[in-house]
Curated annotation (Swiss-Prot):
This is Large ribosomal subunit protein uL30. It comes from Chlorobium luteolum (strain DSM 273 / BCRC 81028 / 2530). GO terms for biological process: translation. CDD domains: Ribosomal_L30. The lineage of its organism: Bacteria, Pseudomonadati, Chlorobiota, Chlorobiia, Chlorobiales. Pfam families: Ribosomal_L30 (PF00327).
Length: 61
């Protein structure tokens, strides 16, 4: 599972989100809509994605 990477793109704004969601977006390295980052596919990253799943789009690379 560690060989794979995830391409995470923020598709919605964090305005109106909870503090936890804002902190998670920042921890993922995002901040504005259409920002994209690549992260290792591991349980920690998957958990962060689950918190903000309505704000991001995830693709396997």
């Amino acid at each position: 599972m560690s060989d794979k990477k995830l391409k995470i793109t923020q598709v919605r704004s964090i305005i109106g989100g909870t503090k936890k969601q804002k902190a998670t977006i920042q921890a993922l390295g995002l901040g504005r809509p259409h920002y994209t980052v690549e992260r290792k596919d591991n349980p920690c990253t998957r958990g962060q994605i689950r918190v903000v799943q309505h704000l991001v789009k995830v693709e396997e690379v």
